[in-house]
Amino acid sequence: MKKLIVTVLTSVFLAGCSTYQKNADIPIIDTHIHLYDTTRPEGLPWPPKDDEVLYRPVLTEHFDKVSDENGINATVIVEASKWIPDNQWVLDLVKHDPNRYIGLVGSLEIGTPDFKKHLTKLSKDGRFVGIRMRERPGGDSFFENEAVWSDLQLLSDRNQTLDVLMFQYSLDDVDMISKRLPKLKILINHVAGADIEGKPADPKWIAAVQKAAKNSNVNCKISGLFQQSHRQPSPRNLSFYQSELDVLWEAFGEDRLIYGSNWPVTMRGGTYGEYLAVVKGFFADKSRAAREKFFFKNALKFYGLPALKH
């Protein structure tokens, strides 16, 4: 009996190792991390002070360690602060290591008089690749503001990118934007806002994903899996997330899925290594070409970034 248990455990261990070894020589770009400093004299708008997990300094030295431990070659930072100067603050913070910190998805309020001015200024730095829509001023009337569409058109004209957080926006919003601006590069964050419960995916969500994915300019990040789980602490087994991941794979295919973590928010659900293991597990049976696209090539193409430097 003891020998049987040892054999089973060894098999499980080797299976896990084989997944990592299969990806060991494939570079990884994490397209979704946040950096901030809670000790700044001016403070910061996010995370809130009562967040026991996130309210602490999260700086390059912290991600460097995570990155080195997990084989992450480079990263794209997503600005979570709504304060405009914080875009430049992050660019300055990471300028010492341009090979690791290769891009910034900024935070600028679309539909405001100074949007173009701020976008133009920040874009002088080639690492500033685009912006993320996070908050929705005006609520349901947001898209009735023609200035919103002018700013989105500007992004498209400049070949810059639009990340969309599925919090105050919907997949129907993404579908509408992509149809009106078919050349705008759009990236849906956090597994398209899936509510993951470890059972077959919600049919309404599936239909919305399929509708949005019909637009060739729409892409999706496999990010924030642990945060989208209704069960906490987040399950570490791939089977819990399988249904939603299968839907996204079928809808977007190997050319329009991109890897991201949502670190340090991932720490609410587990370690970075545990998160990465789930994602790698899903792609373990995919072709090498598909894994290369997902883990780094699609990110370079979408964000318009230069080839990785080793």
Regions found by a protein language model. Name each.
Residues K2-V8:
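Sec-dependent signal peptide recognition
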Residues L4, T19-Q21, I26-T31, R56-A74, ...:
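Mid-to-C-terminal alpha-helical segments outside catalytic/metal-binding sites
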Residues A15-G16:
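C-terminal motif of bacterial Sec signal peptides marking the signal peptidase cleavage site
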Residues H32-Y36, H190:
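Histidine-centered divalent metal-coordination motifs
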Residues P47-K82, Y101-E109, V129-R136, L162:
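Divalent metal-dependent hydrolysis catalytic cores, especially in the metallo-beta-lactamase
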Residues I84-Y169, M176-K179, K221, L225, ...:
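Active-site gating/metal-coordination segments in enzymes
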Residues F142-I258, K309:
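Catalytic pocket-lining loop regions of alpha/beta-barrel enzymes
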Residues N262:
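Active-site glycine-centered loops adjacent to acidic/histidine catalytic or metal-binding residues
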